[in-house]
A protein has these predicted regions:
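Catalytic, metal-anchored helix/loop core of enzyme active sites in primary metabolism
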Residues: 1-384
Length: 384
């Protein structure tokens, strides 16, 4: 029985992780956390009976306690789980003794310290939180190596590369080929991007994701963040990572070796596939009967990204190559700008302009620690 802690159980990755748990009787959920969606986590608690729960929002945590006490009196649950709140509660959840693996599906910088706590506690990590590696990859991967902890990628692209490298660790890699769908504006002329609305940006052609990730995909900032993740996950320099637009989202990524061989991972666009592989590695278990039908594919397209049109991707490569604290600046400025765009306070093109402005005025720290990373994040979030 593998015991799972899910940080961010009410989000897109969290709910799909629970779908995988439902399919596998040897997976047991012992920890659930959420920001403030107590309606959903209440139903999850009734179904999965975790031992430990964290609700980040203190007021919502009190409301959840009341509902659980009522449920206990009515016989809906046998035991009320321990409930904590805030950052410290999230860190406790990550290091909870009775879990073997931590799924980090929280969104934002809040995921860094809990991931560090989980690694220090010897937990394997199913990593879905981009910021952990984008901002603190130099810290996380070193610590994981020291503690003998496995980090399994949940992003479809990184999972694909991870799969392509199985049994080939000693082979020389020439390039990591990180695929991208190109988002909803792949074929939109650059001069029309200034008129993009929130509603249009939220319509991804292939994937069902949360709002922020969907917008990040439309600007290709998301792919820039994934390049940074790949740099740390696979210990590869940025100049050996190439982004390839694959509009059908069938080829999830590939690895080119020095002998010229290219190994790619293909499948239907379904996040449950990489989630399941991370939870049950090295096994491949049934996820759904939605299999890839090669005969139904008329073609597979591969397109070089336009770095003038998708300036966010170009800025990401600059930040990653220069390193230090610049990836944190890139991430924080994007997070702040996307939040403003979702609130309809800025235009679509302002997102990338805000990122560029913050990168240009930042004085780089070569080896930022977690305190540096969090300080930079706060300064940018409050300054935008």
């Amino acid at each position: 029985m593998k015991k799972i802690a899910i940080l961010g159980s009410t989000g897109s990755i969290g709910t799909q992780t629970l779908d995988i748990v439902r399919l596998n009787k040897d997976l047991k959920v012992t920890v659930l956390t959420a920001n403030k969606n107590i309606n959903l986590i209440f139903t999850q608690i009734l179904e999965f009976c975790p031992e430990f729960v964290c609700i980040f929002d203190i007021m919502e945590a009190e409301l959840l306690k009341e509902r659980l006490e009522t449920a206990y009196r009515e016989g809906q649950i046998e035991k009320i789980p321990e409930i904590t709140t805030g950052v410290e509660g999230l860190i406790e959840a990550a290091a909870y003794e009775n879990s073997d693996m931590v799924v980090t599906a929280v969104v934002g910088m809040i995921g860094i310290r809990p991931t560090i706590a989980a690694i220090n506690a010897g937990k394997d990590i199913a990593l879905a939180n981009k910021e952990t590696l984008v901002c603190a990859g130099h810290i996380i991967m070193k610590l994981a190596g020291e503690k003998g902890v496995n980090i399994y990628p949940v992003d479809s692209e990184h999972s694909a590369i991870f799969q392509c490298l199985q049994g080939r660790a000693d082979n020389r890699i020439r390039r990591l080929l990180l695929t991208a769908s190109g988002g909803p504006f792949l074929y939109t002329p650059i001069e029309e991007l200034k008129d993009v609305t929130l509603e249009r940006a939220l319509k991804h052609p292939n994937w069902s994701m949360g709002a922020k990730v969907t917008i990040d995909s439309s600007t290709m900032v998301n792919k820039g963040l994934e390049v940074c993740e790949a740099r740390w996950l696979f210990d590869t320099e940025p100049d050996k990572i190439e982004v390839v637009i694959q509009p059908q989202s069938i080829v999830h990524s590939a690895v080119e070796f020095e002998d010229g061989s290219v190994i790619a991972q293909m499948g239907v666009p379904d996040m449950k596939l990489p989630i399941s592989y991370a939870l049950t590695y090295p096994e491949r278990r049934f996820v759904s009967d939605n299999y890839l039908d090669l005969f139904s594919l008329s073609k597979l397209d591969f397109i070089k990204p336009d770095l003038n049109k998708f300036k966010g991707l170009r800025l990401a490569f600059t930040a990653i190559t220069e390193g230090g604290s610049l990836p944190t600046v890139f991430n924080a400025a994007n997070e702040a700008a996307v939040a403003l765009f979702i609130q309809k306070k800025i235009g679509y093109l302002d997102i990338v302009n805000i990122i560029e402005e913050n990168l240009n005025r930042h004085i780089k720290i070569d080896y930022p620690d977690v305190d540096d990373i969090e300080r930079i994040q706060r300064e940018i979030i409050y300054g935008v």
